[in-house]
């Protein structure tokens, strides 16, 4: 039986259900690697009717034999990470397989304060940041002024590394944003304490991954957020500060592209977005409320109500292209169960012309009007279906329509939050690379 190293990415604006899909695939993985992002992302896993909400720790932590590595491309809030570890321990989940890259950057208290202050100052130009300090952490990383996990393990080095940044950030907080300064000694002592608790999990990320590759272990790379939030390829400036696309796995984990065998994109059967920015298929009124309520569309990280809309095939095809998707996992199909008809965006109208590509300008994107095709609904429950043939004919037709529109086959269909509410057409890790559910 062949094995594969797989990247799991979000094919929309995040919140697609990657946590469940990664959890499902983690059962077949030897190593699960989170390669970018921080506590601005979140995923929800349901185990034995228990809802576990994680922001930093990969879903694979639920499997004792699986190594879960938080890679160099991530930014770590140690306070949040330790809370997650404590929550897992309280639920009798073994955390010995968790490993943390020594070179991952650390979100400091001043990053969070600056993030909130800068977003507030933007006023009407706000971008919808989560306020968790992710952008300022990545900014310090780019300016070569950041703190890394390895710095938390050495008192002298941390004091030296923080001397300049703390002075600079306190000056910014006080003089520019009117925020009380931080107590430098208190910050240093607090983060040295975090370092002591995290020390048993800290490893050389590159050595860990490549040792696994040499041993022919299969590796699952887990992205956070989604394609349209990518810093370089998303709806800029309404994006995150890292690269959630599949190429980000190479940089954030420290591997070459030849190590990756397949890329699976996760997309909801409709579309959601949190925060600001254009959203051509966004719904208002009763259908929006219905999707939000049935889908439980509230952010894991922010608790904000998500904006809901019809499935957008234009951004879907874009996600296929920029990620090199081999197959799709379609989630929350069951949320559409009660609708008598379902619309799918197949193109946009921009300045009176039909376009089938994603505009690079946010201003142009905001002027796009969706061109829809309408399909019949199935108006019966799908949550109990476990095989493709159990699905209503119109639900199968809808999935085939999406596969044809996206020009990529569907490997997995999710019909609820629980693990068993899933139809696996083919295991992307163990199965042969062939056409799955397609038109």
UniProtKB/Swiss-Prot annotation:
Its EC number is 6.3.4.4. Binds 1 Mg(2+) ion per subunit. Keywords: Cytoplasm, GTP-binding, Ligase, Magnesium, Metal-binding, Nucleotide-binding, Purine biosynthesis. GO terms for cellular component: cytoplasm. One of its GO terms (biological process) is 'de novo' AMP biosynthetic process. Substrate binds at residues 300-306. Its cofactor is Mg(2+). IMP binds at residues 15-18, 40-43, 130, 144, 225, 240, 304. PANTHER family: ADENYLOSUCCINATE SYNTHETASE. This is Adenylosuccinate synthetase. It comes from Prochlorococcus marinus (strain MIT 9303).
